[in-house]
């Protein structure tokens, strides 16, 4: 955490919001350049329709030192409310977010722990050599997080714990 002014209740509030309206994901990059090789990126997103809540989330993220948030707003259908979405894509920012939220997360804790291990390993790999290929562990963690994030499926907590323990 870069700024010590952040309070514990702000972190628990943010974690509760992220448990309900957020996502931690490892996504596979698909471009013409990556067809023959693996490429992944980490993305943490938060979506909400309440502008006041979104501004509060932005304030807490800035206190953490996360300034590079992609904020967009859109109205998906004419009779729907305006939706605001943050996306955090930088590995360093995701590590900061995950490290701070994991102690307070409930439903998405196992997913966040897997993503944090992935992020930590990729940051270390960047320091070791300019080109550091993805490992089988990276592939496994991508698959695990993908399964845990399937819409409409709420994985059994025992299964989630087993997945987190294996990785």
Task: Indicate residue ranges for each PLM-predicted region.
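Internal intein/HINT superfamily modules and their associated LAGLIDADG
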Residues: 1-167
